[in-house]
Regions:
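Acidic, Ser/Pro/Thr-rich low-complexity regulatory regions
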Residues: 1-124
């Protein structure tokens, strides 16, 4: 089993490190297991933009990389919300430009979803 490939994909989903290196490593890896993309990952990514740790363009690049990885599965029960987040953020030319305000709006939606889920309330 290629645990290193899965770890590299986990790093991308968690946006743990420099984005260009994460995307390059994820493209070169061949994970043998899937990695889950959860609401907490989307919250953390949107927060990076709202607090100034990442640019909106970086969020677009990250969302594209996550969205188009075959080995990334969306959190069960929240596929619609998370797929909508990835599609809208990864294709601003089809929806609206990604801005700090767009990220704040997504944060409210995602945090409300987490808060309404007894299993994740307070644990994202």
């Amino acid at each position: 089993m290629d645990s290193n490939g899965s770890r590299l994909l986990e790093d991308l989903v968690h946006w743990s490190g420099e984005l260009s290196e994460l995307t390059r490593n994820a493209r070169r890896s061949e994970p043998t297991s899937t990695v889950a993309f959860r609401r907490g990952h989307a919250v953390a990514a949107a927060e990076k933009v709202t607090v100034g740790l990442a640019s909106p363009g970086q969020l677009v690049d990250w969302a594209q990389a996550v969205h188009f990885e075959d080995q990334v599965d969306v959190e069960e029960g929240h596929e619609s919300l998370l797929t909508q987040f990835l599609v809208e953020v990864s294709t601003p030319e089809l929806f609206e430009p990604v801005t700090r305000e767009v990220c704040q709006r997504w944060l409210r939606v995602l945090q409300a979803s987490l808060a309404s889920d007894p299993e994740t309330a307070g644990h994202y």
